[in-house]
């Protein structure tokens, strides 16, 4: 370990590591409840391209887990496996196991639509439907057969409040959602995802296209939501991973190099590859 990581306030990528020294008891994976488990997992885009190699990972319940690593390392591919978004790729196949609360996500009898209700996803670019703000949030509920206006009203308000958006849109719920700012659209998409009460929320670089103020609101929202949901976030932003996550996984060339509580991984990584990445030597 170089001298930089032994300073009282070591820095990685220009980041003050005191950001992640929260003054709380160090997290220990053995004390956590497992939500998602990955066992000897391989993913192939086709017969010639293997994107994930022998991944073993436990993601704890109601914590924020960040996936970091250089572009092309497999972090978004792994994220999309959790709700089988990669099923849409012709020729893709998997080996190994991926479990959600001990149930095999890739089991023969799994209803993929139900899985995607349980495991919601928010993408890098906000994708509101060309409908009203209200109907964006109510959409998933209507698909599930909810018709009661009273129930819909209640869930829409609750979801928008949870997404820290209610006060900004409560007087214009009938307006088209595409008229919202980028940051508001992303929070609306999160509200839409949590309206159907998923167990897990997957966030694929949710703030990368947003301005700093909108990014901060998304990060604050992630922190608030982890009391109710297991959250997995892919990010290229090292500072963001440090600020919002409890655990961090570093990936490189399709392999999981290191996983641990965020404070330890950033300040005292076990693997040289991890240290090289977080200190900016490559990536």
UniProtKB/Swiss-Prot annotation:
Keywords recorded for this protein, A-Z: ATP-binding, Cell inner membrane, Cell membrane, Membrane, Nucleotide-binding, Phosphate transport, Translocase, Transport
Catalytic activity: phosphate(out) + ATP + H2O = ADP + 2 phosphate(in) + H(+)
One Gene Ontology CC term in the entry: plasma membrane
Bilayer topology term: Peripheral membrane protein
GO aspect biological process, one term: phosphate ion transmembrane transport
Residues reported to bind ATP: 69-76
One Pfam entry name: ABC_tran
Enzyme Commission (EC) number: 7.3.2.1
Residue ranges of domain ABC transporter in the record: 36-278
Homology family: Belongs to the ABC transporter superfamily. Phosphate importer (TC 3.A.1.7) family.
Biological function: Part of the ABC transporter complex PstSACB involved in phosphate import. Responsible for energy coupling to the transport system.
Protein name: Phosphate import ATP-binding protein PstB 2
Natural source organism: Nitrosococcus oceani (strain ATCC 19707 / BCRC 17464 / JCM 30415 / NCIMB 11848 / C-107)
Upper lineage: Bacteria, Pseudomonadati, Pseudomonadota, Gammaproteobacteria, Chromatiales
Gene behind this protein: pstB2
């Amino acid at each position: 370990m170089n001298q930089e990581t032994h300073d009282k306030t070591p820095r990685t990528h220009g980041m003050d590591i005191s950001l992640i020294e929260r003054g709380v008891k160090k997290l220990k994976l053995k004390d956590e409840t497992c939500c998602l488990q990955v066992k000897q997992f391989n993913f192939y885009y086709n017969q010639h391209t293997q994107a994930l190699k022998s991944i073993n990972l436990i993601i704890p319940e109601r914590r924020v887990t960040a996936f970091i690593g250089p572009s092309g390392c497999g972090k978004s591919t792994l994220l999309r496996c959790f709700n089988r978004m990669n099923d849409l790729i012709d020729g893709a196949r998997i080996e190994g196991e991926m479990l959600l609360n001990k149930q095999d996500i890739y089991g023969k009898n799994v209803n993929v639509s139900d899985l995607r209700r349980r495991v919601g996803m928010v993408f890098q670019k906000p994708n509101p439907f060309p409908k009203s703000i209200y109907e964006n949030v109510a959409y998933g509920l209507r698909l599930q057969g909810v018709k009661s206006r009273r129930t819909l009203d209640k869930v829409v308000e609750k979801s928008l409040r949870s997404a820290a958006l209610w006060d900004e849109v409560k007087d214009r719920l009938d307006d088209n959602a595409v008229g919202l700012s980028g940051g508001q659209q992303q929070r609306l998409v999160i509200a839409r995802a949590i309206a159907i009460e998923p167990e897990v929320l997957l966030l694929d670089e949710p703030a990368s296209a947003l301005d700093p103020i909108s990014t901060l609101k998304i990060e604050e929202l992630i922190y608030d939501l982890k009391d109710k949901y297991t959250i997995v976030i892919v990010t290229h932003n090292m500072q963001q991973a440090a600020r919002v996550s409890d655990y961090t996984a570093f990936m490189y060339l399709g392999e999981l190099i290191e996983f641990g509580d965020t404070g330890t991984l950033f300040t005292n990584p076990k693997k040289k590859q991890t240290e090289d990445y977080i200190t900016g030597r490559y990536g």
